[in-house]
């Protein structure tokens, strides 16, 4: 049963792991504060990528159909499930080993690694509070499943105005 007000969960609270998993059960997602991601870096990434999306450099990084990295323009955007109407967005798929404008790579890579470490923490919380019969079905710890993954990506979204 869902509730009407999404709780904000501080990662500094003693029961943040339990509150996070409870929020996933009740709402399907969670709102976390006091997380380890550097919001100054996040805002800098938004600013830097806005310049990229406004430039013709996007054409030098058209997405690669085989690797799925690079720039996806408005014409390439996906549609919501069951809808024929494409989303009004453009985006860039970043993989650490993939293509990226050289002047944007270092900041994005630093953020990618921080987000990956954060994801491992959240996955460990989910595992810690999963029922035993569910955990028994895991082939490995949830937090290990993203180790050295070649398929984890960072998507930089832009909604044109």
Enumerate the predicted regions with their spans:
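Peripheral, non-catalytic segments flanking oxidoreductase cores
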Residues: 1-161
């Amino acid at each position: 049963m869902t509730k009407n007000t999404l709780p904000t969960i501080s990662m500094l609270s003693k029961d943040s792991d339990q509150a996070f998993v409870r929020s996933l059960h009740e709402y399907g997602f969670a709102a976390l504060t006091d997380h380890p991601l550097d919001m100054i870096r996040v805002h800098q990434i938004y600013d830097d990528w806005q310049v990229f999306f406004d430039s013709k450099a996007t054409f030098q990084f058209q997405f690669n159909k085989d690797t799925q990295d690079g720039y996806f323009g408005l014409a390439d955007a996906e549609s919501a499930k069951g809808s024929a109407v494409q989303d009004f967005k453009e985006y860039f798929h970043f993989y650490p080993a993939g293509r990226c404008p050289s002047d944007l790579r270092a900041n994005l890579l630093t953020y990618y690694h921080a987000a990956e470490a954060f994801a491992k923490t959240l996955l460990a919380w989910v595992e810690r509070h999963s029922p035993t019969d569910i955990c028994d079905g895991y082939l490995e710890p949830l937090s290990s499943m993203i180790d050295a993954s070649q398929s984890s990506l960072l998507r930089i979204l832009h909604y044109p105005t």
